[in-house]
Amino acid sequence: MVPHKRGKTMLKTDFRDDPGFRESTRPDAPHRSWRVAAMAACAFCAVALFARIMTYPMQHDEQFYISAGVLFDRYPLYSGIGFSHLPNVALLFAGAFALLGDTHYLLIGRLLAFAAWIGTFAALMLIARTYARGTLIGGLMIALLALNPMFLNTTGMTATNNFLPVPFMLFGLYLFLRAADRSEPSPALAFASGFVLAVAAGFKANYLLLLIPFAIAALLVPPAVPLRSRLLRVALPLFVGGIAGGLPSILYALDDPQGFIAHIVNAHRGPQLGYWSAHPDPVDPKVIGIGSKLLLAHRLWLSGVAMLTLVLLLSLVAIAVVRRQTFAPRWPLLLVGALAAMGAAISFVPSPSFPQYFTPPLPFAIVLVCLLFGSLDAPGRDLARPVMAAVFALTVITGAPLLLPALTGLAKPGGWTGVQVARDGAAIAARVRQRAGDGPVATLSPIHALEGHLPIYPHFALGQFMVRAAPWVPEGERRHYAYFVTPGTIPSLLSAQPPAAILTGMEGDTDAALEAFATERGYQPVPLSLKKAEDAKRVRLYLAR
């Protein structure tokens, strides 16, 4: 450890050398019963999360990601079905479906979402036990995340790429701290950190920007080690690990660089913005301008559990200032602070903005709470505990009413969303095969058809998202789509290859072209009552006569 004189602040190289990180007697080492209670509370929270994930209604975004996993081995990911994100989520789902069977796709996706939560809990507990020497602080960290309403909606409850990167980012952070927060850096841990961080970024392109603070830190820490040693033992292994973890994205990019950019970058700019500009929703206006994004960020970050996290952070900073004689800034604090700031910055990148885009800084803010608390001396911790207890109580009051009611769903597994959707898909498939044979089903809501093992059109493989934006895809980029279709060309496509059935009613006005074709060609409408699906009140199955 780098020594420091009273009244001066210097950068320390190892958290564990500081008195605040030594094992101590009470109150820093709580009685065993308190630790058991904290672990029991975390387990109960995990069970409640499982119940909410299993019973949360199917969302539109899941039509995109689940279908990509199901069709991964049937069509090219980008040029075939028009996937517009980095490939890791499709690879994960495809691998899980291949391993666990070709049915109950949505249920498997939800189980993976729950696994991401368990991985996140494990990463937070590891960080807490290593850098704050306490189970209770780990329980608080888990509460700040799991009881935050921003994660108890589509963001954390569904099979999408919104939450899946979080455990990988936190484990990557933990491995980096363990690799460099020592007198002799560990190349193996640095490699592992780079690998896991690259895997996280492969789920969501915006997370690539979160790698920048790690790259800078790899050149600067540990500060007591010569630059050459930092390059060889931290920066180089981190880079090599990143290349290894990022291979799926790298290989796709090298295979067709222009097509990769067209799908990953351009599809989110011109086409999507073009669609929303042409179809404004006065009831639910989309957030596009920076002013509107700032207002949305204000509403999300300065309310609820996110606000409580910020209050706790500011309180710990104030205590650190009061105890500045024994408090020294440490590079892990600076790194995690930079990650939280970068996470806040990337929240403003996508357009239009949705609430799930404003969650990236929150896990790092929670880790920062842990590191700040761990940096305090014993009197400083005594000052912090009442504030932390109050924040914990308010967090439970805020989040528990959203989380706990789902527990009743555990008693009826047959009503879980993934099970219900698979059952409805099988019923739809039985009707189609009985009346119209094994022809393809035309639908912008493909999960039910895929759950019933019905063939679908690759043009509609990812649901409504690409079809509705297709008119704004530049002519020069349409060659990157093997099955390109716009709402205006749907009739000619279906005339050339008539569908055995048409399923509509979950995608609003985007279904209009399919419904018009079904009515014009005399398909027989069959009203359906689909449960556990978003916007499924007026579903129609049109059967060929």
Where does each model-flagged region fall?
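Short periplasmic/luminal acceptor-recognition loop of GT-C membrane glycosyltransferases, typified by
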Residues: 84, 195, 206-208, 304, ...
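Hydrophobic/aromatic-rich transmembrane helices and adjacent perimembrane loops
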Residues: 155, 170, 203, 209-212, ...
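Transmembrane-helix motifs of polytopic, lipid-linked glycan transferases
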Residues: 42-43, 111-132, 147, 152, ...
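Transmembrane-helix signature of polytopic, membrane-embedded enzymes
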Residues: 34-36, 121-147, 166-167, 334
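Membrane-lumen/periplasm interface segments of specific transmembrane helices
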Residues: 234-279, 345, 349, 448
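Extracytoplasmic catalytic/substrate-binding loops of multi-pass membrane glycan-assembly enzymes
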Residues: 54-68, 80-95, 103-107, 257, ...
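Membrane-interface transmembrane helices that cradle and orient dolichyl/undecaprenyl
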Residues: 132, 170-192, 219-225, 295, ...
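Membrane-interface alpha helices of multi-pass inner-membrane proteins
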Residues: 142, 187-205, 211-216, 243, ...
